[in-house]
């Protein structure tokens, strides 16, 4: 905890093409070793592929995918009386979005298509249809929270 008060969260600038802060955030999630140009190339390429394949606006498909990936509940470890309990808690909106973006990129990297652009496009399409590894991860997290519902009264 900082001694000098609350730390103000810096806001990201919207990206130049889609004018969306969400797109900037996923570019930052994809980026490795400070190579933002490469990350933007991957994302814009993936969004173009999505638009070609579906005939819909890529940003709409992307938002739909994020809604399907975003977790509502998660479990947090809480130590009470020398024992650790997995306590289900609601996920704050900002963390919800961050987790969704992180899972999307993480599971896109694990796919076996040839290029990252292709993998990301396929994972976004799968997520928008309610399938794919990222959606499975969300279901897993929800199942864990549901299983530990008995400890919900330990919430803080």
From Swiss-Prot:
Sample GO molecular function, one term: rRNA binding
PROSITE patterns cross-referenced by the UniProt entry: RIBOSOMAL_S7
Entry's Gene Ontology BP terms: translation
Membrane found in the keyword field: no
CDD domains per the UniProt record, alphabetical: uS7_Bacteria (cd14869)
UniProt key word rRNA-binding: yes
Any one cellular-component term (Gene Ontology): small ribosomal subunit
NCBIfam families tied to this protein: rpsG_bact (TIGR01029)
Name listed for the protein in its UniProt record: Small ribosomal subunit protein uS7
Taxonomic classification: Bacteria, Bacillati, Mycoplasmatota, Mollicutes, Acholeplasmatales
């Amino acid at each position: 905890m900082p001694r000098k008060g609350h730390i103000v969260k810096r806001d990201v600038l919207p990206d130049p093409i889609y004018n969306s802060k969400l797109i900037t955030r996923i570019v930052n999630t994809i980026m490795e070793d400070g190579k933002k140009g490469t990350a933007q190339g991957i994302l814009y390429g993936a969004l173009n592929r999505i638009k070609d394949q579906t005939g819909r606006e890529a940003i709409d498909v992307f938002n739909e995918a994020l809604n399907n990936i975003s977790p509502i509940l998660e479990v947090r470890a809480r130590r009470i009386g020398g024992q650790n309990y997995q306590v289900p808690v609601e996920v704050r909106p900002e963390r919800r979005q961050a987790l969704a973006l992180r899972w999307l990129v993480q599971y896109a990297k694990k796919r076996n298509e040839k290029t990252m652009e292709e993998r990301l496009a396929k994972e976004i399409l799968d997520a928008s249809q309610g399938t794919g590894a990222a959606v499975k991860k969300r279901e897993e997290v929800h199942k864990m929270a549901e299983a530990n519902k008995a400890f919900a009264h330990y919430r803080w």
